[in-house]
């Protein structure tokens, strides 16, 4: 399990690929931009157990570093048949205590929710039995705009970064804690590398071309 709840904290980050004063110069194909599918890959976990946790994200809304969203994004055990759509923010007027998956319907003091719960996380089943008896899940940060930029994923004393399973994670000896440590050339020799558990911002293996390796700050 992973728990980051100290005063200093830990951040996973990538740099904005353009001049902040000239957004027209941005490379919007960069993996940290939401793109047309409005989401950014943030992790892969392989386990035989159930998943729970939360993390905090920093998003530059429409690529503008002066207009950022920061929020704690929780996720519940992966069990699609048990998900109940609704407003899961207790601060909202229409909070639904029975809901387990936010559907963007939260209303605050008569006004439509314009932030917060609109940024959410999706956990998807990626592949099964690369490692016998275990399931590989992928985590995606859901965005609002195609040019939203996921700048960092982090945890600290005020907003812990938590990934927990009931049985532990699978880690390949040839992998790493971040996706940029995964060398695709090794996959044919070590198939279990495809099931390695890691965190990321957008990329799923070693950075290539103009891609930037994922950085961490402790």
Where are these regions (language model features)?
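Non-catalytic macromolecular-recognition regions in eukaryotic signaling proteins
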Residues: 1-84, 111-218
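Extracellular calcium-associated, cysteine-rich motifs in secreted modular proteins
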Residues: 81-112
């Amino acid at each position: 399990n992973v728990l980051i709840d100290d005063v200093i904290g830990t951040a996973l980050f990538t740099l904005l690929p353009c001049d902040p004063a000239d957004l027209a110069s941005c490379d919007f194909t960069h993996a940290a931009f939401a793109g047309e599918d409005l989401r950014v890959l943030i992790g892969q976990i392989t386990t035989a157990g159930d998943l729970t946790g939360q993390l905090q994200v920093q998003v530059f809304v429409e690529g503008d570093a002066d207009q950022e969203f920061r929020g704690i994004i929780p996720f519940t055990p992966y069990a699609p048949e048990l998900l109940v759509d609704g407003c899961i923010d207790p601060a909202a007027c229409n909070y639904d205590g029975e809901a387990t998956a936010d559907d963007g319907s939260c209303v605050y003091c008569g006004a439509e929710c314009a932030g917060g719960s609109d940024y959410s996380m999706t956990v998807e089943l990626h592949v099964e039995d690369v490692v016998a008896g275990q399931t590989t899940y992928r985590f995606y940060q859901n965005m609002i705009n195609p040019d939203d930029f996921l700048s960092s994923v982090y945890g600290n004393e005020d907003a812990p970064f938590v990934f927990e399973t009931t049985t532990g994670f699978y880690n390949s000896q040839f992998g790493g804690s971040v996706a940029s440590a995964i060398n695709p050339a090794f996959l044919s020799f070590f198939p279990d590398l495809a099931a390695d558990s890691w965190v990321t911002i957008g990329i799923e293996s070693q950075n290539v071309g103009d891609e930037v390796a994922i950085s961490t700050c402790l």
